[in-house]
């Protein structure tokens, strides 16, 4: 399977830096990496999607066409920008913003019906990891049980919560075992990405694992040259 790289700007990128980053990436991305790169700015960092060489996505959207949902963006906002790719289930939205499994299912089903490409994030906390691999498998299976795993526009990103933003990636053995288990659950055509303190130093080794189909990258993607270095490992 062709490997891919995704940049998640979270809420860290200044608005105009985000705009400049997108334009520069479009100009400088090498042809062998066209269609293998995704970028998820925050909402103010988005631009009308006229980009031909990479996929522009949104970090979040409310599962309605439009309406009285103060502070939210909806499918019509994204469609007006010609954006049809969405992150769902990121741990920061699960934990900080209390998005429940039932709400994540509602989001998934709504945007599946709109034929959006969905990047669905899963991952366990440290307390679960410390209980052993059986507990991890049960936890991740539960996170996936409410969504359509045969949806053709699905990408799954495994991000162990204890590794996100800690500068402590999961070990190569942990990634190998966990991705191997998840590959048994997922449709064989569904890409499975790893995220969690990915950086220039470890990205190439992680991509070398057969069951890792790409990377979802946080802070290491916030400087364009760093992200392009990681892209070069694809």
Curated annotation (Swiss-Prot):
Keywords: Cytoplasm, Gluconeogenesis, Glycolysis, Isomerase. Pathway: Carbohydrate biosynthesis; gluconeogenesis; Carbohydrate degradation; glycolysis; D-glyceraldehyde 3-phosphate from glycerone phosphate: step 1/1. SUPFAM superfamilies: Triosephosphate isomerase (TIM). Its main location: cytoplasm. This is Triosephosphate isomerase. It is found in: Cytoplasm. Substrate binds at residues 8-10, 165, 197. It comes from Helicobacter pylori (strain HPAG1). It comes from the Bacteria. The gene is tpiA. Pfam families: TIM (PF00121). One of its GO terms (cellular component) is cytosol.
């Amino acid at each position: 399977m062709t490997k891919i790289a995704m940049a998640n700007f979270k809420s860290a990128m200044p608005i105009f830096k985000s705009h400049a980053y997108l334009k520069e990436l479009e100009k400088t991305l090498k042809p062998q990496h066209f269609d293998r790169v995704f970028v998820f700015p925050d909402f103010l960092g988005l631009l009308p999607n006229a980009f031909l060489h990479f996929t522009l996505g949104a970090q979040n959207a409310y599962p309605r066409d439009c309406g009285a949902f103060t502070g939210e963006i909806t499918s019509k906002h994204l469609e007006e920008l010609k954006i049809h790719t969405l992150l769902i289930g990121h741990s920061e939205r699960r934990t900080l913003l209390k998005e429940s499994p039932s709400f994540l299912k509602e989001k998934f089903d709504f945007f599946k019906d709109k034929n959006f490409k969905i990047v669905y994030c899963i991952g366990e906390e440290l307390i679960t990891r410390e209980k052993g691999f059986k507990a991890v498998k049960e936890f991740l299976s539960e996170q996936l049980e409410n969504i359509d795993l045969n949806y053709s526009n699905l990408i799954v990103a495994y991000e162990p919560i204890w590794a996100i933003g800690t500068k402590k990636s999961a070990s190569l053995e942990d990634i190998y075992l966990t991705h191997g288990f998840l590959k048994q659950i997922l449709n064989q055509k569904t890409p499975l990405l790893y995220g969690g303190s990915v950086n220039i130093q470890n990205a190439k080794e992680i991509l070398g694992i057969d069951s890792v189909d790409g990377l979802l990258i946080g802070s290491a993607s916030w400087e364009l040259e760093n992200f392009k270095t990681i892209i070069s490992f694809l």
